[in-house]
């Protein structure tokens, strides 16, 4: 209870501010009280909520003068003040009374094919902060209720995915129900700016798809963009295990980009 302010805690047994931790160290926490009268601050929170669905890089900026808030804002990349640019990274930073924290990162995972593996993959990715779009040409599958953790479900033809724009921040995961559809989607995805491209399948299937793409004019450099077979080699067999393997590779790719 009470107002806003800084509070320090000792993370090891002690007689002052002991919170029962045994790992050691110290943590300082800033508590921000929001009341209905703080209309400007409430507006910032509403902006924050609205921006989360816009697929943009988003940061919190909190500047303190002692324990008084000088500045409380939510910023996209284009709104970052030039003099504070060094504070806006992929990590939370506290320096000289200025605290910044990344709230959202641009980029979504587009899963082309919502079958058994796709359905298992959606909640795994959502739980590690990927925004997820599922794209399928089967009307019975392409329904939001089949993927409650997905941000978007699209019903469309695999031969024409032009309704989905892939940027350099996006992840394309190809796991359609057939070889022909995999080929069609890959041929289109390779012409996009997608930052990550992965395709499920056996090594034999991947080799045949690669041959077709090369025959169509794609280069070895183009195909080097494709993670295939997709996923880290953890000997996964079930859809749920494969989903973990795929998500792990995507997490690794995301971490290396930071």
What does each model-found stretch correspond to?
Residues 151-157:
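Conserved SAM-binding strand-loop segment of SAM-dependent methyltransferases
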Residues 176, 194-195, 200-258:
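Adenosine-phosphate binding glycine-rich loop
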Residues 158-168:
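Short amphipathic alpha-helix with an adjacent loop that forms part of the alpha/beta core around
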Residues 137-140, 158, 178, 201-205:
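Short, ordered loop/turn segments at secondary-structure junctions
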Residues 181-194:
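Rossmann-fold NAD(P) dinucleotide-binding segment
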Residues 1-137, 141-151, 167-171, 205, ...:
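Segments forming oxygen-rich coordination pockets for charged ligands
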């Amino acid at each position: 209870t009470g107002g806003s302010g800084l509070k320090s805690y000792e993370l090891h047994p002690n007689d002052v501010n002991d919170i029962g931790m045994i790992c050691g160290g110290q943590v300082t926490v800033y508590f921000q009280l929001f009341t209905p009268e703080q209309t400007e601050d409430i507006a910032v929170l509403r902006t924050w909520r609205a921006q989360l669905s816009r697929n943009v890089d988003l940061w919190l900026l909190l500047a303190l003068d002692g324990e008084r808030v000088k500045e409380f804002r939510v910023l996209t990349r284009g709104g970052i003040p030039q003099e504070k640019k060094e504070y806006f990274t992929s990590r939370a930073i506290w320096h000289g009374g200025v605290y910044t924290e990344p709230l959202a990162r641009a980029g979504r995972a587009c899963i082309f094919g919502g079958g058994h593996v796709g359905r298992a993959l959606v909640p795994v990715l959502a739980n590690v902060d990927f925004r997820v779009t599922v794209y399928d040409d089967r009307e019975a599958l392409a329904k939001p209720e089949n993927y409650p953790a997905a941000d978007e479900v699209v019903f469309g033809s695999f031969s024409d995915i032009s309704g989905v724009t892939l940027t350099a921040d996006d992840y394309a995961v190809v796991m359609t129900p057939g070889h022909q559809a995999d080929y069609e989607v890959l041929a289109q995805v390779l012409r996009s700016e997608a930052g990550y491209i992965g395709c499920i399948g056996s090594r034999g299937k991947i080799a045949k798809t690669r041959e077709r793409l090369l025959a169509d004019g794609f280069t070895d450099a183009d195909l080097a963009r494709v993670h295939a077979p997709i996923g880290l080699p953890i000997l996964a067999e079930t859809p749920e295990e494969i989903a973990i393997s795929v998500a792990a590779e995507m997490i690794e790719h995301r971490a290396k980009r930071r």
